[in-house]
Amino acid sequence: MNSILITGATSMIGVALIEEALANETEVFAIVRNGTRRLSRLPSSPLLHVVFIDSLNEYQSILKNITKPIDVFYHFAWLYTEKQYRNEPVLQNENIAISLKMVEFCKALNCKKFVFAGSQAEYGPRTDKIYATDRVAPVLSYGIAKYAAEKLTANLCSQNGIVHACGRIFSVYGKNDNEGTMLNYAISKFKNKENAYFTSGQQKWDYLNEKDAGNAFFLIGDKVNSNFICNVASGISLPIYIY
């Protein structure tokens, strides 16, 4: 794997994948939204090419900026990830159309492998161990849209001779985690020597560090050569209070 393209490049897992790719001397084209406040997250490297865009729907306008053949197309970008938007059907539906556009983008680049970032939310509420072969039963609009986008992009890839791989992301944490997560809340309180308040912490969570998630997606792109689905998780689920 000599070169990759990433949408959602300034997201936590996007940055982690970029760092992993650069460590393996893989050239990276990072698609970044104009005006993003997270540009400083990206590392500096002659192998990293930042390509700015106003909207992913306008991908044709940046084709000329992709100056090398792309071996793997990673689609991490997703709108309306904030908690208040996760059950908004109309908003989440926008992501399905964008995801299909990204397969068209992949095809326009003559790239033969498309990696989609799925989600634990596709399985719906569960208390037992989850396997990638399990039946999906999403409840929130976010999970429904993720599964719809996963299946539809897989179909479109199949129609165009493109390998489709999906990593369904569970609970990832790290230096670029979003504000407001439990871990960020706790760390912030502890650093300021303030009290932090929690529930009894009986819920079970499978936490994975962002670096490991970046490595997982790198390996998916590098090693997978046929249609593929996996869970991106540690495989160990523990009650929150233990963490």
PLM features per residue range, with description:
Residues 7, 31, 73-79, 114-120, ...:
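SDR active-site strand-loop-helix element
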Residues 26-36:
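Conserved glycine-rich Rossmann-like NAD(P)H-binding loop of the short-chain dehydrogenase/reductase
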Residues 141, 145-148:
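Active-site helix of classical SDR
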Residues 186, 223-243:
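Mid/C-terminal beta-alpha module of Rossmann-like enzyme folds, strongest
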